[in-house]
Amino acid sequence: MSDTTKVLVLYYSMYGHIDTLAKEIAAGVAEVDGVEVALKRVPEHMSAELLSTIHARTDFDTPIASVDELADYDGILIGTPTRFGNMAGQMRNFLDQTGGLWAKGKLVGKAGGAFTSTATGGGAETTLLSVYTNFLHHGMVVVGVPYGTPEMFDTSEARAGGPYGAATLAGGDGSRQPSDKERTIARFQGRHFAGVAKKLKG
């Protein structure tokens, strides 16, 4: 067994907000000695024509994950935009394929965390909780974000992110990008999560 703790940052992004947070979180994970991070996406199921119609990004170059490889990691951080207070269908579809891993207990005892993006804030926490219920059914250990960075207390500007997980406000038209404070919280989440995953692995 390797002494290295392996963490997967797995995400779905339509307009780039989650992609930005995922990279910040991965950078935070990488700051912890003895922890290796992988950054991957779940497959897209919408047609190229429809994605073009809604002006979604299609230029992401992050590798696509397979369901079976989840068992190879000691911790999994999942990022998904909010869809009516729930995770995006693309992430839902991917997680619905983990029944085989569940049947064999392959994810029991591993660390799990999540992060999200919403238009104006509605549904952020329920989206994160919709991810966490999957972790609990798999016997994983849910890891949130403690109030361990000043940005978690900052109310000087509109921002997202809290103890449930890092988040960003995209604005009604998606034009707002993650702020410096939101990105700092995301990086802190990655760093904190990596430390917990490392301890759980022992």
UniProtKB/Swiss-Prot annotation:
FMN binds at residues 13-18, 82-84, 117-122, 137. Its EC number is 1.6.5.2. Substrate binds at W102. Gene3D superfamilies: 3.40.50.360. It comes from the Bacteria. GO terms for molecular function: flavin adenine dinucleotide binding; FMN binding; NAD binding; NADH:ubiquinone reductase (non-electrogenic) activity; NADP binding; NADPH dehydrogenase (quinone) activity. GO terms for cellular component: membrane. Keywords: Flavoprotein, FMN, NAD, NADP, Nucleotide-binding, Oxidoreductase. Binds 1 FMN per monomer. It catalyses: a quinone + NADH + H(+) = a quinol + NAD(+); a quinone + NADPH + H(+) = a quinol + NADP(+). NAD(+) binds at Y15. Its cofactor is FMN. This is NAD(P)H dehydrogenase (quinone). It comes from Rhodospirillum rubrum (strain ATCC 11170 / ATH 1.1.1 / DSM 467 / LMG 4362 / NCIMB 8255 / S1).
